[in-house]
Swiss-Prot record:
<comment type="function">
    <text>Involved in the early part of the secretory pathway.</text>
</comment>
<keyword id="KW-0472">Membrane</keyword>
<feature type="signal peptide">
    <location>
        <begin position="1"/>
        <end position="22"/>
    </location>
</feature>
<protein>
    <recommendedName>
        <fullName>Protein kish-B</fullName>
    </recommendedName>
</protein>
<dbReference type="GO" id="GO:0000139">
    <property type="term" value="C:Golgi membrane"/>
</dbReference>
<keyword id="KW-1133">Transmembrane helix</keyword>
<feature type="transmembrane region" description="Helical">
    <location>
        <begin position="53"/>
        <end position="73"/>
    </location>
</feature>
<feature type="topological domain" description="Extracellular">
    <location>
        <begin position="23"/>
        <end position="52"/>
    </location>
</feature>
<dbReference type="InterPro" id="IPR042863">
    <property type="entry name" value="Kish-B"/>
</dbReference>
<comment type="similarity">
    <text>Belongs to the KISH family.</text>
</comment>
<keyword id="KW-0333">Golgi apparatus</keyword>
<feature type="topological domain" description="Cytoplasmic">
    <location>
        <position position="74"/>
    </location>
</feature>
<dbReference type="InterPro" id="IPR009653">
    <property type="entry name" value="Ksh1"/>
</dbReference>
<keyword id="KW-0812">Transmembrane</keyword>
<dbReference type="Pfam" id="PF06842">
    <property type="entry name" value="DUF1242"/>
</dbReference>
<keyword id="KW-0732">Signal</keyword>
Length: 74
């Protein structure tokens, strides 16, 4: 279990959020329903999806590094 109030927990949450929104961008129904707004509270989902799709290599390497950290070091 990862605590959200610690730095590593916040990083895990942010990475999972970005990866989930990038996945939502690939699914047509979810894209039209969730990622249609670009401003406001719902715009956070759109911005996370853009980060996940444009920086997919950096995000995937970060996910692998964070998984290694959580499983073996922490």
């Amino acid at each position: 279990m990862t605590n959200v109030y610690s730095l590593d927990g916040l990083l895990v949450f942010a990475l999972l959020f970005v990866c989930t929104c990038a996945y939502f961008r690939k699914v047509p129904r979810l894209r039209s329903w969730l990622l249609s707004e670009k401003k406001g509270v719902w715009g956070v989902f759109y911005k996370a999806a853009v980060i996940g799709s444009r920086l997919h290599l950096a995000v995937s390497i970060s996910c692998i590094a964070m998984a290694f950290y959580v499983l073996f070091i922490k």
